[in-house]
C-alpha cells in the first residue's frame, strides 16, 4: 500500500487548481500544466490542499501514489519551476544558446543544432555549461536526455555531455 498517497499536496499561494471530470489543470506563476487523472483515483480540494483517494479495486493504491507524485511535480513546476544543468567535457566541445535553438560543437564534422520545445529555455553561462529551465519536469528530463545522447560521456577520458550531478565511472586504459 502506498504511503505517499496518504499525504495531501499543499497548494502555495498564487496557484489555482481546476478539476473537471478526470482532467486536472494547475495554473501558477511559471505557466499552466494539465494532466488526465486515472479513473481509479478521486481528487478532493479543501483548504488549500489536494487529497487523493482510491476506488474499490485492489490495485488502485498504486495509481493513487503515482498520481499524487505527478500532481506534486506539477504544483512545484508552476510555482517554482525546475532546472537541470549539463556539463560538456572535451577539447573543442562547447555550446551556445540563441533563442530557442542550442548550437553544439561536439567534435563532429558539423555543428549540431537542437531546437528546444515549447516551454523549455536554455542558458549557457559558460560555453561548457548548459542550464535548462522548465515548469514541466518530465519534458525537462526528456530534453536533457536528448541533448546528452548526442555525445554521452565515455569512461576512458570522460569526454562528452553529462548531467551536472552525474559521476562517470572511469576505466583504466589497457596496459602493455
From Swiss-Prot:
Instruction: Give a GO biological-process term.
Output: cytoplasmic translation
InterPro entries named among the record's database cross-references: Ribosomal_uL6-like, Ribosomal_uL6-like_a/b-dom_sf, Ribosomal_uL6_a/b-dom, Ribosomal_uL6_bac-type, Ribosomal_uL6_CS
Q: Where is the composition biased (Basic and acidic residues)?
A: 153-170
How the protein assembles, per its UniProt entry? Part of the 50S ribosomal subunit.
Q: Its gene?
A: rplF
Please name the GO terms that the record assigns under molecular function: rRNA binding; structural constituent of ribosome
How is this protein named in the record? Large ribosomal subunit protein uL6
For the keyword rRNA-binding, the answer is yes
Presence of the UniProt keyword Transcription regulation in the record: no
Q: Which GO terms describe its cellular component?
A: cytosolic large ribosomal subunit
Q: Provide this UniProt record's keywords sorted from A to Z.
A: Ribonucleoprotein, Ribosomal protein, RNA-binding, rRNA-binding
Q: Which Gene3D superfamilies match?
A: Ribosomal protein L6, alpha-beta domain
Please report which protein family the annotation says this sequence is part of: Belongs to the universal ribosomal protein uL6 family.
Q: Where is this region: Disordered?
A: 153-176
Explain the purpose of this protein.
This protein binds to the 23S rRNA, and is important in its secondary structure. It is located near the subunit interface in the base of the L7/L12 stalk, and near the tRNA binding site of the peptidyltransferase center.
Amino acid at each position: 500500500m502506498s504511503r505517499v498517497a496518504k499525504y495531501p499536496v499543499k497548494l502555495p499561494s498564487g496557484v489555482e487548481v481546476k478539476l473537471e471530470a478526470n482532467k486536472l489543470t494547475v495554473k501558477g506563476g511559471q505557466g499552466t500544466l494539465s494532466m488526465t487523472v486515472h479513473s481509479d483515483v478521486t481528487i478532493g480540494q479543501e483548504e488549500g490542499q489536494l487529497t487523493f483517494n482510491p476506488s474499490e479495486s485492489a490495485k488502485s493504491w498504486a495509481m493513487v501514489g503515482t498520481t499524487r507524485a505527478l500532481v506534486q511535480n506539477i504544483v512545484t513546476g508552476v510555482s517554482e519551476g525546475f532546472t537541470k544543468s549539463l556539463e560538456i567535457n572535451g577539447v573543442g566541445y562547447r555550446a551556445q544558446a540563441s533563442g530557442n535553438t542550442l548550437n553544439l560543437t561536439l567534435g563532429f564534422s558539423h555543428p549540431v543544432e537542437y531546437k528546444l520545445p515549447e516551454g523549455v529555455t536554455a542558458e549557457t553561462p559558460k560555453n561548457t555549461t548548459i542550464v535548462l529551465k522548465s515548469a514541466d519536469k518530465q519534458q525537462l528530463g526528456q530534453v536533457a536526455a536528448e541533448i546528452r545522447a548526442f555525445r554521452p560521456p565515455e569512461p576512458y577520458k570522460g569526454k562528452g555531455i553529462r548531467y551536472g550531478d552525474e559521476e562517470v565511472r572511469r576505466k583504466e586504459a589497457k596496459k602493455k
